[in-house]
């Protein structure tokens, strides 16, 4: 099967999302799929396999007119350009994280898997309007809706009315290995959460846990002043 992963971010990069996508494409290649990773012409000037330490046959296609992270009008233009290239190479199945790209793919009746990491709060007005008007995520051309956490799954069911049977929870992981030596036992731990304060990311769970667990100290790093006030 020829699979095209349409990815808006930089490759190669140490960005967590880039690491996850690289490993995912490598895994699909090992399963004998013809995998194409379509991205903007951004990222480090290092060979893909060497940077990630992967042995795979993932084909990288960088769309050269997008030399920076696609923002504004380029956000929409990259979606169109990446889909056109995917069609040109006769893709059987598309994979994307991008809500606008997904909308275009189902509009032209292409088979697609959507990988969802967050809610719609960080999306632009166009995307929010499209998902308010149309029942996008229940479209028959979507093979599966991948939610990376149960929190995202609950959001999809409650807020976007996605059918539960269409959603599969598959958490992201990194290929990094850590070895901790000479750890000292402590009566109290300092627990840190780093990342987005979007509810679907699980930050509200950390707050609830901190209220319940009085023994340890909890710290949250991320978000803006508005999100912090809302979290409290």
Which residues does each PLM region occupy?
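Nucleotide-sugar donor phosphate/pyrophosphate-binding loop at the beta->alpha transition
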Residues: 74-78, 110, 118-141, 154, ...
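Conserved donor-binding/catalytic core segment of Leloir-type glycosyltransferases
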Residues: 4, 146, 183-201, 207-213, ...
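Membrane-proximal helix-turn-helix segments that form the acceptor-binding/catalytic region
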Residues: 23-26, 83-88, 103, 107, ...
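Nucleotide-activated donor-dependent transferases that construct or modify glycoconjugates
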Residues: 1-21
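N-terminal strand-loop element at the rim of the active site
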Residues: 7-14, 26-77, 152, 223-227
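A short, histidine- and acid-enriched strand-loop-helix "catalytic/donor-clamping" loop
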Residues: 10-13, 67-70, 91, 102-103, ...
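Glycosyltransferase donor-sugar binding loop
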Residues: 43, 194, 217-231
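Donor nucleotide-sugar binding/catalytic pocket of nucleotide-sugar-dependent glycosyltransferases
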Residues: 39, 117, 135-181
């Amino acid at each position: 099967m020829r699979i095209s992963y349409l990815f808006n971010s930089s490759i190669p990069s140490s960005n967590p999302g880039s690491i996850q996508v690289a490993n995912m494409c490598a895994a699909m290649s090992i399963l004998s799929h013809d995998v194409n990773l379509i991205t903007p012409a951004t990222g480090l000037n290092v060979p893909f396999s060497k940077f990630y330490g992967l042995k795979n046959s993932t084909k990288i296609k960088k769309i050269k007119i997008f030399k920076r992270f696609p923002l504004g009008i380029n956000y929409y233009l990259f979606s169109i350009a990446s889909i056109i290239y995917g069609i040109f190479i006769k893709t059987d199945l598309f994979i994307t994280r991008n809500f606008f790209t997904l909308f275009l793919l189902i509009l032209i009746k292409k088979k697609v898997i959507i990988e969802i990491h967050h809610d719609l709060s960080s999306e632009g007005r166009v995307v929010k309007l499209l998902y308010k008007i149309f029942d996008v995520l229940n479209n028959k051309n979507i093979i599966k809706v991948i939610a990376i956490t149960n929190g995202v799954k609950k959001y999809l069911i409650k807020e976007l009315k996605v059918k539960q049977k269409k959603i599969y929870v598959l958490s992201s992981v990194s290929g990094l290995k850590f070895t901790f030596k000479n750890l000292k036992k402590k009566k109290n731990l300092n627990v840190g959460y780093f990342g987005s304060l979007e509810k679907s990311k699980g930050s509200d769970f950390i707050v609830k846990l901190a209220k319940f667990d009085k023994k340890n100290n909890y710290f949250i790093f991320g978000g803006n002043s508005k999100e912090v006030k809302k979290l409290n």
